[in-house]
A protein has these predicted regions:
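PDZ/PDZ-like groove recognition
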Residues: 222-267
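Acidic/histidine-enriched alpha-helical segments
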Residues: 72-80, 109-112, 211-230
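Terminal peptide-recognition signature
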Residues: 21, 59, 238, 260, ...
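His/Asp/Glu-rich mid-to-C-terminal helical/loop segments that flank catalytic regions of hydrolases
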Residues: 57, 64, 68, 180-226
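PDZ-domain C-terminal substructure recognizer with occasional recognition of PDZ-binding tails
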Residues: 272, 287-315
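Conserved PDZ fold ligand-binding element
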Residues: 260-282
Length: 315
């Protein structure tokens, strides 16, 4: 058994309620845990500059900002850097099961996971969890920014906000989008958009300032994808484009030597059918993927340059 720790800091403003600001600080180390998407990962350092040094730096910067600015906010702040996220949200789950503060006094939780690769052309910022409190969407729509914001209502997702949502706490998760370096040694500091991350943090500050004008947020459950119920025995070796808003599952990158690459799938293809499942979005794709096992062969249909292409893929 390997033990690890969550790192927690508390800013006491003498307020009734507390805002939690968090990010995971773990990554993939030397590529030995089978989570790497590199073709030959073992022994290669995976620094995880975007995933998730960017979020960890965001926690530290917001802690510095709120500790030094004047006047005091109407909230206390709990800053947390979680361990064990890559292995299954272990750090945030452990904290939520053994909190150091009264959770009935937590107003909401903000999670930052991969906020360091803002695309300067699209300016896409994805915000998950907007359905977890009635005030989130009107507030986000009200705040002026240069971002092209994609809102996702679900409280459950593949990052640490999920642990807090499951404790009936409103959440937001900020994400600048997927990229070809995800879970690879090439996710390094030279590719971080520092100015873009600064803008994301300034936007989060605006969100927090807006919530100061409101009563304690009201939690509401959302319709969530059943990601936790599925078990995956196979992978295609491709990267979904989570910011894609069209019909189908847009491929952001394809890993060389994996089933998708061998079948002829390319970056930019849009998967519209996998096996017997029509794919309208990423969740449909994941649902289809969960039905296969190693050495299965199935048909996959993609749209490429406006034309449908059929091909066979073997897992």
């Amino acid at each position: 058994m390997v033990s690890s720790i969550d790192v927690v800091g508390y800013l006491d403003n003498g307020a009734e309620n507390t805002v939690v600001i968090g990010a995971h600080y773990d990554h993939l180390g030397m590529g030995l845990d089978h989570n790497s998407l590199d073709a030959n990962p073992e022994g290669k350092i995976h620094n995880g500059a975007d995933d998730n040094a960017s979020g960890t730096a965001g926690v530290l910067e917001l802690a510095r900002f709120f500790a030094q600015n004047q006047p005091k906010e109407k909230f206390n702040f709990l800053f947390i850097c979680f361990s064990g996220e890559e292995l299954g949200l272990f750090g945030s789950k452990k904290f939520c099961e053994n909190p150091t503060i009264d959770f009935s006094k937590v107003n909401y939780m903000i999670n930052m996971d991969m906020i360091g690769r803002l695309n300067d052309s699209t300016k896409k910022l994805i915000i998950y969890g907007v359905g977890t409190a009635p005030d989130w969407v009107p507030m986000i729509d009200k705040i002026q920014s240069d971002f092209s914001i994609k809102k996702d209502s679900a409280g459950i997702g593949p990052s640490d906000q999920t642990s807090f949502y499951l404790k009936n706490i409103p959440v937001l998760h900020f994400f600048t989008g997927q990229h070809a370096d995800y879970h690879k040694p090439s996710d390094d500091i030279n590719k971080i958009n520092f100015i873009g991350e600064k803008k994301v943090l300034e936007y989060i500050v605006k969100i927090i300032e807006e919530t100061e004008k409101l009563p304690k947020l009201i939690f509401q459950k959302t319709k969530n994808p059943d990601v936790g119920a599925r078990k995956y025995k196979v992978t295609l070796g491709l990267m979904p484009d989570y910011a894609f808003e069209g019909k189908g599952m847009h491929i952001d990158d394809v890993t060389k030597g994996k089933p998708a690459s061998k079948a002829g799938l390319q970056k930019g293809d849009i998967i519209i059918k996998l096996g017997e499942v029509n794919v309208g979005n990423v969740n449909d794709y994941m649902k289809a993927l969960s039905t296969f096992k190693k050495e299965d062969t199935t048909e996959i249909i993609v749209v490429r340059d406006g034309k449908q292409i059929k091909m066979n893929v073997t897992f």
